[in-house]
Amino acid sequence: MDLIDTHQHLILRDRVGYGWTADIPALATGDFTEADYAGLTAGKGVVGQVFMETGVDDADYQAEARLIAERVGTGGFLGQIASIRPETDAGFDAWLEEAQGLGTVGFRRILHVVPDDVSTTDRFRANLRKIGRAGYPFDLNFLSRQLIPVG
């Protein structure tokens, strides 16, 4: 059976920062490259992958998407889920527009690293609607305690 990996990560320290890895010994140093990924998936039926943004340092999230865009359409890269910051209007529209030309198939914001109320603002919700109107899904990444009980 042919498989598509819809959550591929790479760690490319020479291009972007990964501050969150500092306290995780197995991830604190070194890279996880396309060659590493290919070695792990060889013979496993993986015929393509969608890159999932890797929670890079805030200053690097756009650089990461631009870097991955160079790979989309090659070596099995089918697209990417790019990071976006719907909690701010500064540069939001410009990034949403640019990212559409970077092989982006969706967007994600890691919410468990920001204050819990970030996603409750009118600005956040308005910017999510912009993502939806542009035809893209938004991936929510949060801790269970951040999910408002339903029912």
Q: Residue ranges of each PLM-predicted region?
A:
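Active-site gating/metal-coordination segments in enzymes
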Residues: 62-146
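Single-residue recognition of alpha-helix boundary sites
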Residues: 16-18, 75, 150
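Alpha-helical scaffolding within the catalytic cores
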Residues: 29-38, 91-94, 147-150
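A short acidic (Asp/Glu
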Residues: 61, 150-151
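An N-terminally biased module of ancient metal coordination in phosphate/nucleic-acid-related enzymes
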Residues: 1-70, 100
